[in-house]
Amino acid sequence: MTGNIDQLMKDMARDLLGEDVIDVLSFLLDNKTELTDEEMANKLNVKVNEVRKKLYALAEHGLVSYRRTRDKETGWYVYYWKANVDQINELLLSRKREILNKLKARLEYETNNEFYICPEDKTKYTFEEAFENEFKCPKCGVQLVYYDSAKMREFLERKIKEIEEEIARETKVGSS
């Protein structure tokens, strides 16, 4: 089960932040303990500033967290980092809510606009854009044709319903 969660976290990090944070996240997941940024930098053979930059990006999305203590000898703060494996469900729910909001915004855009499309390059324009260009494609000059976005709206409505049901199920399971 841990392998699945680790992979899920890596996939999420890759989707949100790209490939460069995976080395630091993988290292934290593999070690299963709290580590300082200096320890990670030494083991990964990377500059401490690079590791910190990646850790801050991961923390911003809730994938890692830290505990801060003061070094008694130097008086400096030491940060101990760990992967938030135990919070993966909350992270996934949060991500689904973000996607849901984007889909709802897109549905509203599709519902509140009339569209025209270029038959050549398939670029879609709102009525206002088409009107400004005299219903000709600004790229190639071809006459724009009316585009019925009913299928797109149906698709978005279906996806919104699916994600809302998933969120409701997962919220119910999480609270029981």
Curated annotation (Swiss-Prot):
Higher taxonomy: Archaea, Thermoproteota, Thermoprotei, Sulfolobales, Sulfolobaceae
A Pfam short name: TFIIE_alpha
Protein name per the record: Transcription factor E
Biological source species: Metallosphaera sedula (strain ATCC 51363 / DSM 5348 / JCM 9185 / NBRC 15509 / TH2)
Classification via InterPro entries: TF_E_archaea, TFE, TFIIE/TFIIEa_HTH, TFIIE_asu, TFIIEa/SarR/Rpc3_HTH_dom, WH-like_DNA-bd_sf, WH_DNA-bd_sf
Alphabetical list of PROSITE patterns matching this protein: HTH_TFE_IIE (PS51344)
Keyword terms of this UniProt record: DNA-binding, Transcription, Transcription regulation
Record-annotated HTH TFE/IIEalpha-type domain positions: 5-89
Family: Belongs to the TFE family.
Matches recorded under HAMAP family: TFE_arch
Domain notes: The winged helix domain is involved in binding to DNA in the preinitiation complex.
GO molecular function, a single term: DNA binding
